[in-house]
């Protein structure tokens, strides 16, 4: 018996010795390893994933770019500058695959099951390694995605400060910084009636304090934009809602944000992200046109631009191209959340955009806009619930970036070839006449137009040539 006890004691001693002399811990995400719980952990999160490089259209490597060549110049601008791609922290590092009907399906090896500040710091390190391997310089965040909520506002701010200091340190020696930051004003029960449109004045004040802090940390990290997405800013029924008062409150909230932006010296763009519904039945920023009207009514049109999300366009009954053009012609196109939805599904599926035709239309708007900076293309998109390998995170972003790159190449081809532009020019050719110019310059009243109508007689109406336009478009694919 004593021999057995001695043997067990010897094994324990050997095990302890090996722990003391072991190499620093790593986090082999691709090998199913476990992470250290230490705040100071510094291992590799993706040791089996190489730095993603451009290999050209003939490549069969899923971990390589086929169409996105960051340094390639197109229309006098590097491809990376056309896009300014960004990774969404919430989907990439907080998405679990859970849905209203099922539990989480993604268990990334670096997660320890807690919502601690220590775990938040680990995720931030993973984020920076992910960005560097993709070759992406921007990322986006909600305040409560990157740091845990506390029991008080002061505790929440302290948690956020700790994680932000790590992010600031990780930024050193790189070009990485936030494309935009925002405050999460929809998850906590206090925001069930909204934040800026809540029926409770105390909630309004709390939301303002949270946005104030989120603006500060975005500015501190060198963020280039700040986003307002009003997931709870709307109503479930008008029977218990004072819509006019709520919209006035929302405007006062935005006015305060503009004032604070100027006070702290934040030079970034303030962005409103339209969405018609979900989680609220009816949101006040339903679509680009609704948001533009709100900004004009309250004298905020020169202080904000719009962050257009393609899936939100689907939910509002529009195409992404429609929303982009609405924003562009109003001088409000500020950023694009590059994702797509499912036309057969009535909710926000947040899929990576892989439709080359849709990407081409998106890029036609961006080219006409002269680019998107200081905004960019944020991949507000998540893996499917059934995609559970770590490499899927990379493959999804590579696919999305390649799709947008193909869209850019196609859009340039269409615009330079000129047939589509010529078709549109011919369709509106009568407006280049003397009468057309008089109307466009506001010099033709109804009496004058009546006189002209009698002179012309029954007007000729030409074909719109939609099928030809579609043929020209498809030929570039």
Swiss-Prot record:
Keywords of the record, alphabetical order, are:
Carbohydrate metabolism, Isomerase, Magnesium, Manganese, Metal-binding, Xylose metabolism
Instruction: Output the GO biological process annotations, alphabetical, semicolon-separated.
Output: D-xylose metabolic process
This protein's GO cellular component annotations are: endoplasmic reticulum; Golgi apparatus; plant-type vacuole; plastid; secretory vesicle
**Residues reported in the UniProt entry to bind Mn(2+) 2:** 309, 312, 348, 350
Q: Which reaction does it catalyse?
A: alpha-D-xylose = alpha-D-xylulofuranose
Documented EC number(s): 5.3.1.5
PROSITE patterns per record: XYLOSE_ISOMERASE
List the Gene3D superfamilies hit by this protein, alphabetically.
Divalent-metal-dependent TIM barrel enzymes
Q: Where is the active site?
A: 142
What cofactor does this chain's UniProt record say it requires? Mn(2+)
Question: Where is Mn(2+) 1 annotated to bind?
Answer: 273, 309, 337, 380
Recorded GO terms, molecular function?
metal ion binding; xylose isomerase activity
Q: What class of enzyme is it?
A: isomerase
Cofactor info, note text: Binds 2 manganese ions per subunit.
UniProt xrefs under Pfam families: AP_endonuc_2 (PF01261)
- Cross-referenced HAMAP family: Xylose_isom_A
- Belongs to which family? Belongs to the xylose isomerase family.
State the name under which the record lists this protein: Xylose isomerase
Organism this protein belongs to? Arabidopsis thaliana (Mouse-ear cress)
